Amino acid sequence: MKLVVGLGNPGPEYARTRHNVGFLVADRLALALRAEFTLRKFASELAEGRAGGERVWIMKPQTYMNHSGESVGSALHFWKLGLEDLVVVHDDLELEPFRVQLKVGGGHGGHNGLKSVNAHVGGPDYARVRVGVGRPPPRMDPADYVLGRFAKADEAPLEECLVRATEAARLAIELGAAKAMNQVNRRASAAG
């Protein structure tokens, strides 16, 4: 069994913000796996599907970003899953906009959702689908930037990025993070 977590904030005021790309990818992964968010457990919305012969739970924590780890930690404990069974999808200020990268472990880079997940699951050694949102303009607070919506001109590249991020999460489930990283990150490098 695998757990894929899309990080984001609940509520319509946060829909389609940079900080909610994890939720957007979770929605697309659920659609691809013919799963629906019908279960409410662990202070989250859950959808159950199958990929690569594996049972997959897709989670959207409803705790707000800074407390996402509470939901993730509870689910891992309940299902007796290890960090190798976890894939987290999140926005990343350090990656250029619309770039997708798969990695295992590493620092939280100031991302409060990742800080919370790390604290509640016992460390950072899980697969992450990083979705680049770029840096804020000079003198703009990064918190305001990530809570801002994408511009209309960004809709086409955003949709393409979400397709690639969804595929990265699916490959991490089906192939394991190490093999999936070779494919995902090679494609990302070739794309520029």
UniProtKB/Swiss-Prot annotation:
Entry's localization field: Cytoplasm
Q: Provide the reaction this enzyme catalyses.
A: an N-acyl-L-alpha-aminoacyl-tRNA + H2O = an N-acyl-L-amino acid + a tRNA + H(+)
Q: What is its EC number?
A: 3.1.1.29
Q: Name one GO cellular component term.
A: cytoplasm
**Residues binding tRNA, per UniProt:** 14, 64, 66, 112
* GO BP annotation list: protein quality control for misfolded or incompletely synthesized proteins; rescue of stalled ribosome
Q: Which CDD domains match?
A: PTH
Q: Name one GO molecular function term.
A: tRNA binding
Which residues are named in the active-site annotation?
19
Instruction: Spell out the InterPro entries in the cross-references.
Output: Pept_tRNA_hydro, Pept_tRNA_hydro_CS, Pept_tRNA_hydro_sf
> Positions of the site: Discriminates between blocked and unblocked aminoacyl-tRNA?
9
Site residues (Stabilizes the basic form of H active site to accept a proton), renumbered to this chain: 91
Keywords attached to this Swiss-Prot or TrEMBL record, sorted alphabetically, are: Cytoplasm, Hydrolase, RNA-binding, tRNA-binding
**Family per similarity comment:** Belongs to the PTH family.
Which NCBIfam families does the record match to this protein?
pth (TIGR00447)
**Role description:** Hydrolyzes ribosome-free peptidyl-tRNAs (with 1 or more amino acids incorporated), which drop off the ribosome during protein synthesis, or as a result of ribosome stalling.
What interactions and quaternary structure are annotated?
Monomer.
Q: What is this protein called?
A: Peptidyl-tRNA hydrolase
The scientific name of the source species is: Anaeromyxobacter sp. (strain Fw109-5)
